[in-house]
Amino acid sequence: MNALAGFSIWAQRNRWIWAAIGVLLLWLVLSVVTNRFSLSSLSGVILSASFLTVVGIGQMFVVTTGRGNIDLSVASVITLSAFVALLTVKGQDANLAIGVVAAILLGLAVGALNSLLVVGLGIPAIIATLATGYVLATATLLSNKALPGFAVSPALKELATGRISGVPIMAIIAVIGVTASSLVLRRTVFGQLLSAVGQNRAAARLAGIRNGPVIASAFIISSVLASLDGLLLGAYIGGAFLEMGQPYLLQSIAAVVLGGTLIFGGSATALGTLFASILLILIVTTMQIVGLPPGAQDIVQGIVVIFVLALAGRQALARRASADLADAGKNPTERTDVQAVQARPK
């Protein structure tokens, strides 16, 4: 019983473990039920999950800012970035630097726009980023008309599909991104500010923290990573098409929350985002093996997202209630005064 209690306490601090356990269990089930799973097939799953991890890390920073903030423009950013890469790189390695700069500038512009809408104008993040996504969708249609053909830079193609000693290069990029994000969250001032703002904006403001720049930085990080992800994803599939980023909208949110990042903000885990991305790709792979049609697959993924969000919401409310009780216990006089005021006849 003591060991179980100790593991429970440890798991609360390392919430990524549940996604990791889910990956292990689902992989074992698939290996037993089918004879088609091996280390090579796992490598393919990890490759697909790497693209989701990159955009999921950016989504994680936005969710960490609290108040239910999510970035719904990532799907449109991914798609538009793939088209911009084709238009700027034109299949030549000599133009690769121009394509990378264009992707970064696109991410910075979209992130700045989202920040202006959310921080400057006070529009809820869901509405603001959804509106931005519609604007980007129009720009994507215009880019599609201007696209002369599909030609991918060989160097970019190698980066997106190549392997080093059997390990996908994209997986290495994803691990580097997860490691860097973990260091930012745990070892830097920005990570501490981000957690403080996500936990309690009023308290952070009283502590002298400028909430606006911190929240704006999170949206910019999300857009830049989504744009770079679109650049690599376009090279991976060998072109670009409308709605190519759409699957990453719900999946990026699910990967963040399923990985252990609190939906109400204040605490994030980049490692959990990585494991949850692998788990979600395994779920999709399982549905494809079963033979579910695409529509049914979307329904199952939607149910998974709803279940995870509902569970995360209940856990957050439970933590908040426990914190309120703890605060009341620490300040019995204040609690009595509040109760007296509420009981006073009007």
Residue positions per predicted region:
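Transmembrane alpha-helical segments in multi-pass inner-membrane proteins
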Residues: A226, Y236-G302
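Helix-loop-helix "hairpin" substructures at the membrane interface of multi-pass membrane proteins
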Residues: A94-A103, A109-N114, S165-F241, S252
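Membrane-interfacial amphipathic/re-entrant helices at transmembrane-helix boundaries
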Residues: M1-G56, Q92-I98, R344-K346
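Transmembrane helix-bundle core of multi-pass membrane transporters
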Residues: L121, A125-R187, V214-S217, Y236-G245, ...
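Hydrophobic alpha-helical segments embedded in the membrane of multi-pass proteins
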Residues: A49-M60, S76-L80, L108-A112, V175-I176, ...
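Cytosolic-side transmembrane-helix boundaries in multi-pass membrane proteins
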Residues: M1-L26, T179, L206, R210-P213, ...
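Short loop segments and helix-boundary regions at transmembrane helix junctions
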Residues: A5-W10, T65-N69, L108-A151, V184-V189, ...
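Single transmembrane alpha-helix segments in multi-pass membrane proteins
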Residues: L28-L30, T34, L39-G91, L121, ...
